[in-house]
Amino acid sequence: MDKKVLKSNAALLLAAMIWGLAFVAQSDGMNYIGPFTFGATRCFLGSAVLVPVYLIMQKKSGLLHDESAKETRKFTFKVGLLCGAILFGATSTQQIGLQYTAAGKAGFVTALYIVLVPVFGMIIFKKKASWKTWISVVIATVGLYLLCIKEGFSIDRGDVWVIACAVIFTFHILVVDRFGDRVDGVLLSIVQFAVVSLLSVPFIFINREAVSFSAVSSAWVSILYTGILSSGVGYTLQIIGQKDAKNPAIASLLMSMESVFAVIFGWLILHERLSAKEFAGVILMSAAIVLSQLPVGPKKSKTEDEAVA
């Protein structure tokens, strides 16, 4: 295998590992502070830590003082405001859900967006969905049922919040996909993280969260991890990894491994356990995630069909 490809795959897998462990950090942080306090501090740190990354990349590319890059920055700022508002909804519902559900389970339910993106893309933007998308949806639905639905057709409120998070994340990805080729990726993250942090502040008071220096300092490990490693390092590894990735499908699969790492770290660190029914749901959702990202083979031409015949 090409050394560049090997390094690319390693970077993406490491990013997935960092993101998977972030579910554990988020869950632990809820023992000390409220969801909006956590979101405000984490995203402020995430935005701040990406500023030097952006400046270094701009300087290396010679765009830091380039007049032609101004329009891109302006447009990126506008898209960042929209993405930030959507991301606020996604991260807040996820954080609330993590108060009531296991980190590993939350990781897999959140990953449902991978299956939902092509479906909503077809509904909103009229993008054609392949046969494997619909099979993935069916498999994921059965997996979600086994993972979340209990006897008497009841569902934990934590799971409801995380399912809402997956749906909102779907819209976030669709917006990024729509405007991604016209924006600066790192600047977009800086803006959207800053927006999430700002929007979280009033909800700290609306939700009547007790904010104190001692509480925040108790959660400092979780905040630093999610702010610096998950946002700063994880995002940078994604940029490096995708730059030299030869196969987009493999890149997507490696990044989606965050849900698997969420279960592993939840088991190792938080001692979370899945029932046989929930584990079956995890297997089915994993299969749906993998299937949804596999490339569809090119259609054979009439000449090729005749040659085979």
How would you describe each model-predicted region?
Residues 1-41, 85, 93, 153-178, ...:
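Glycine-/small-residue-enriched transmembrane alpha-helix faces in small-molecule transporters
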Residues 20, 24, 84, 88, ...:
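Hydrophobic/small/kink-forming positions within alpha-helical transmembrane segments
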Residues 22-23, 55-110, 146, 227-245:
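Specific transmembrane alpha-helical segments of multi-pass solute transporters/efflux pumps
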Residues 49, 53-54, 113-135, 260-279:
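C-terminal transmembrane-helix exit sites in multi-pass transporters
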Residues 50, 129-149, 167-169, 200, ...:
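Hydrophobic transmembrane alpha-helices of multi-pass small-molecule transport proteins
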